[in-house]
Amino acid sequence: MAKRGGNQVRIIGGEHRGRKLPFPDLPGLRPSGDRVRETLFNWLQPVIINARCLDLFAGSGALGLEAASRGAREVVMLDQAAQVVRQLEANRDLLGLTQVQIIKADALRWLEQYPRPFDVVFVDPPFAANLLSEVCAKLEDRGWLASDAFIYLEEDADRDFPDLPENWRLYRQQQAGQVRFGLARR
């Protein structure tokens, strides 16, 4: 658990609205801010209930736990840091979110396995890792997306989004502070 007054993320909507959850203080761990999440989940509001969601770089859990709080049927959250995974499991259990599965794995390697299509995928890797393009290609090429899937992308505001697979359309995009974020649709 984070120290008192330490790093916390707040669930901003749904069943667990207002709950504050700790997350570890690790380099590169940067939760999507409240304003960004509010905008994102307003965009996703018509589709998030009963959706199958994949959070590839779960980190603080802000996106995956928010999706579960707002009625997603299933949420699979990945992170490769053991400390992060332990905290995500504790937060999931604290909220009683039985539809959330947490996996300790490298996202790129995990995407090599046999796919199960998801309705909504959150792609918010550490900015310094520069993984957006490779992850988007794997999601498309390996069959991880439902036919009408939504893909959330987050990047440093100083960079443009990479070229997306040809059958994706950048549906919405905005900037908030040092973050560029967008929603693509397959």
Regions found by a protein language model. Name each.
Residues 1-186:
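Class I S-adenosyl-L-methionine-dependent methyltransferase catalytic core
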